[in-house]
């Protein structure tokens, strides 16, 4: 009798970026009674919820440093490693930089799962690093109750091309490079609702590395860029709005989702992270339908890049995406701040 295949998602209580601590709780954790340490060379810290830290080392060069890790969102070990690595690498591209090396972060239940499973996870991470043109140069591992994997990534960026949450401008158009609904599809799979024709849809999107960010960063008219992950589209957009003192309009009719997402929402395949996200920033958003909330607050894992583009550069950005065979979905626009209106208006 053949052994049952190992299903990694059965060994964790959370999945992918849905494991992230909610924005509200994270805000409490990051409060400090200590005087702020001022370093004039630290160009980007954690004040504006950016994707990575950036340090000026001189001669117009910034060093990017970031880390990201989570529990399995798929059952296959190799795919889990690929997705976790792609997700971590994305932070560097979202800042407008290029990665130069990575080290692995591995937590593994050595008494529950064979070492060969961990080997496949790391191999998946190594594969993604090679796709990004860098080495997986080392790492650290611990014995943990649940599988955890991710990377700490180092990158470089021109200090004049850093894309910050605080640099967006009113009048910019908003674009996203991947469809939404990853959290919904992975939840549908856990619930046994996923149709055969929708298998691997989410996996394939999560494995795509956001290499295109390095090209977008060359354009001064791309004023801000971030990746959409565990806080959902509205959560990460709210970080841009708050950091840049602007507000946003999101056109729900223009939002692209993975096939089947709306049907699975109707069947109750909404991850717990969706409500945690809404509880954290829902007061900043205009009224939405339940379906809109389930899509726009859906926690993404290795999601797309959200970019703010001045109108005169929209055609150029679309051309870059087309040449790279990357989808580019218009999702809304940025407007002048107005304290009498919601930070983000969903229409």
Swiss-Prot record:
ATP binds at residues 20, 48-50, 68, 91, 139-141. SUPFAM superfamilies: PurM C-terminal domain-like (SSF56042), PurM N-terminal domain-like (SSF55326). It catalyses: hydrogenselenide + ATP + H2O = selenophosphate + AMP + phosphate + 2 H(+). Binds 1 Mg(2+) ion per monomer. GO terms for molecular function: ATP binding; magnesium ion binding; selenide, water dikinase activity. Pfam families: AIRS (PF00586), AIRS_C (PF02769). Homodimer. This is Selenide, water dikinase. It comes from Actinobacillus pleuropneumoniae serotype 5b (strain L20).
